[in-house]
Amino acid sequence: MKSPTFRQIALATSLVVAGLAHAGECPADKVAANDLKGAATAPGGVVDTELASIDLSKENGKLDQRRLRLRQMTIAPGGVVPMHSHEDRPALIMVNSGEVYEYSSKCAVPILHKAGETARESLGTKHWWKNT
């Protein structure tokens, strides 16, 4: 059996993503630069498991030093994913249960994400998450 090509993988991924509910977004009147004073700088109550990955440099697209990862992250009540950047690695986050707040460099207020929703972490985003 032939391995799927990069295009097939990208198409399948886009179809799955298109069918998912979008997560909370920054209110239009709150889109603004946020210096994130007081941002969490250390993880707490977080289990991050990489379930699978694809080395994209070996695919037709030849994306050197890039991997497509499928991860499961569990954030305990009160747990935090510390401040980090998506300067060079976009991501999609799906909230499986509960609710979690995102504190973003692009929004003046916390963004609530609920179970069943997905959040897009786009290039240039700096943020941290907290399960309240």
Predicted features along the sequence, with ranges:
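Short acidic-glycine-tyrosine-enriched beta hairpin
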Residues: 75, 106-125
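Glycine- and acidic-residue-biased ligand/ion/polar-headgroup-sensing regions
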Residues: 88-107, 117
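Short beta-strand His + acidic residue motifs that chelate non-heme Fe in jelly-roll/DSBH
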Residues: 83, 102-103, 121, 126-132
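A short beta-loop-beta micro-motif enriched in histidine and acidic residues
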Residues: 63-67, 79-95
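Short, surface-exposed beta-edge/turn micro-motifs
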Residues: 8, 12-13, 89-90
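A short, acidic/glycine-rich surface segment
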Residues: 55-59, 78-82, 127-130
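A short, N-terminal "cap"/entry segment at the start of jelly-roll beta-barrel domains
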Residues: 2-6, 15, 19-69, 110-112, ...
